From Swiss-Prot:
General function of this protein: Binds directly to 16S ribosomal RNA.
GO function term, MF aspect, one: small ribosomal subunit rRNA binding
Organism: Rhizorhabdus wittichii (strain DSM 6014 / CCUG 31198 / JCM 15750 / NBRC 105917 / EY 4224 / RW1)
Gene Ontology biological process terms, A to Z: translation
Keyword Hydrolase: no
Protein name: Small ribosomal subunit protein bS20
Length: 87
């Protein structure tokens, strides 16, 4: 248990940040799932539009520190390749 006032404050702050970060990661996952759903349906135009919406969310996660830069780049690259393969 936290003994000092500062430690108690850090616990409160960490709980708030965890909630915000969790929501941010969930939002990123939702955008990526929309791209994957469009890919599964075979709709290249919808997939391209969904990827254009997902890209800023992915890289916003990088700038906010909830997703590693390489992870975001890898996800974006793989989705782009899958869209290109639809031809």
């Amino acid at each position: 248990m936290a003994n000092t006032p500062q430690a108690k404050k850090r616990i409160r702050r960490n709980d708030r940040r965890a909630e915000i970060n969790g929501a941010r990661v969930s939002r990123i996952r939702t955008f990526v799932k929309k791209v994957e759903a469009a890919l599964a349906a075979g709709d290249k135009t919808a997939a391209t539009a969904a990827l254009a919406a997902a890209q800023p969310e992915l890289f916003r996660g990088v700038s906010k520190g909830v997703v590693h830069k390489n992870t975001a780049s890898r996800k974006f690259s793989r989705l782009t390749k899958r869209i290109a393969a639809l031809g």
